[in-house]
Amino acid sequence: MKRSFLKSSMLLTPLVFASPIMAQESSESIFDQAPWENEQVLELFSKAWDEGRNYPTKAEFESIGLTFDLEFVRSHSRQRATYKDASKDVVSDINHNRSLWCNLPAGYGKGLGGYPSTQFDQDVFSMWNYTSIFGSWNYGFLQAPGSWVDAAHKNGTRIYGGIKFFEGWNDDGSEGAFLKFISTKNEDGTYKYARAFVNAAAFFGCDGYNYNSEGSTWRDTDWVNFHAEVNRIAKELNIEGFGIGQYTQQPNVSDSNIGYIYGNAEKGKIFDCMLNYSGNKLAYRYVSNSLAAIEKAGLSTDDVYQGQLLVGISSDYWNEMNTETTKQMNICIWGEHDQSRFFQFRVGSSPTNVQENYQLLLEKAFSGANRNPLSRPEISNAWGSFQVADADHANEQLNNSPGFASMFAERTAIGGNLPFETHFNLGNGENYFYNGKVTNGSWYNMSMQDIVPTYRWLVTAKGDMKTFANDIDVRFTHEDAYVGGSCIRLSGATTAGNDIVLYRTALKASAGNVKVNLALKGAK
C-alpha cells in the first residue's frame, strides 16, 4: 500500500531550540515609488557623506517621502558563505567552478510584485542552490524587496538591488541624464557619487546594481571609470559580494570591447558581464574567442556569462554550450521584464495546485526532468515543452530536461555551528500555521523562506548515494504546514527502503551530542 506523510519541520541541534517568527503582513498601498525617482536617494547618501556620515538620517529620508515603507526595501541578512566540494558533487563530469546568473524578475509585477502582501499566488523562487547571482530585473535602483534579498542571502546567493534600463531606440533622455549625474566630479577630480553608490547598497543590504545597457553610455570613458571607482571603494571597505552587473548587445568579449564591458588589467574586473544571445539562442560560437580575449587581458573568466533567453530554454544550443571548451564559460539566463518565465508558464487547477506545479517546473529546469539530480536525461537541444495549455498538460513541461544540475555544481550555505532549523517554508501560504494550527489567512513574505534543500530531490537506494530510486516521491505542498505555509510531502512505497538526502552541510557537530527533531504528520 502506498502511504503519504508530511515532513513539516526539522531541527538539528545540540539540544537548543529557536522560536519561529510570525509572518509580517502589509498592504501594497504603502509602497510609494515616487521618492526613488530622479536619483533622490543617491543624492541623500552623497549629502550625508559630504557631511561626514555614511547614511542619511530618518528626517532626511522623510524629506523625500520615504517613511515606514523604507524598511520593506532594506535587508538585514548578511550573505551566508557557500561551501563547494567537487569530490562530493552529485554530477562529476561538469566544470565545478562554472556559475549560473539568473537575471530574472523578483516577484510578479514591476515595482511592487515581490513585496510582502496577503497575495498567496506569488513568485517564491527557490532554486538558490544552483544560483550564484540573481538579477532583480523588475525594480529600479535599490528597490528590490528586502524580503527577496533576505531569501537570497540565506542561501548564499548574491542579489542586485535593481536595474537601470537604457535602450538606444527608445531614448527618453534618461540615459544621458544619468551619465551626466554619475560623471559629476568633486573639486579634487574624484567622482562625487561613487561613495554614495557603495554606501546606499550597504544600507539597503543588496549586493550592487544591474544595468541593461542597450544605448551608448557603456562606451563612455566616465561610465567605465566611475564604476571602476565604485568597485575600488567597495573593495577597500571589504564589502564582500559587491558587484555591478551589465548587459550590452555584445555577444562576445574582444580586444576592442573588453575594457568597456568587463574590465582591464590595471583596474581588474569592473562589471559582471552578461553577453548577448544571438538569434535568440546561446551564442556558443563566440565562446572560444571570448575566453582567449579574457586570458590575453590578464583577467579571470569567473565573471563573464554567456546570455540565454529563457523563453527558448527548451530548444537552445545546450549541446554546443557544454563541450570541453564552452563549459568553461558561465551562463546567464534572462527572462523577462515583469515576471520570470518560470512563473509565467506555471499552470494549475487551483492556487494551491498552481504553486505546487510551479515548484515542480523549477525542479525540472534545475534538477532535470525526473526531479532527481542522479537521474537526468542526457544534455540535448530538446528539453520538451516549456509552455503548455493548461494543468492537464503539466507533466509535459520540460519532460526531457537534463537540468542545470547537468552543467553547474550544487552549493550549500549551511555551515558553522549547530543548531540548524527549517520548517520547509517557501515564503507564502494560503494559511499561516503555528505548531500545526491555522493562525492566520493567506500571506506572502520571502523573508520567511527557509534555507532550501540542497537537492531536489536526491532519492537513492538505501545506503547507496550513487544509485537513484523513484519509489518515493518528494515535493513541496501548501496543503499543510507545522510553522509557516508549506512543508514537504513524501509519498509512495518501498520494500527495500530509500534514502532521501535533503541537505549537504558543513556543520560542526560534537560526536554523540547531536539530536534531530522532526515534525511528521501521517507517518507510522
Where are these regions (language model features)?
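Solvent-exposed loop and beta-edge segments used for protein-protein assembly and interaction
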Residues: 94, 203-205, 325, 482-484, ...
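Chitinase-like catalytic core of GlcNAc-active glycosidases
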Residues: 93-289
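Extra-cytoplasmic beta-strand recognition segments
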Residues: 442, 447, 453-463, 488, ...
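N-terminal module-boundary/linker segments of secreted carbohydrate-active enzymes
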Residues: 24-118, 122-128
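Short carbohydrate-recognition loop motifs
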Residues: 464, 470-499
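Substrate-binding surface in catalytic domains of secreted glycosidases
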Residues: 212-381
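Bacterial Sec-dependent N-terminal signal peptides
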Residues: 1-25
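Substrate-binding cleft of secreted/luminal carbohydrate-active enzymes
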Residues: 28-70, 304, 308-460
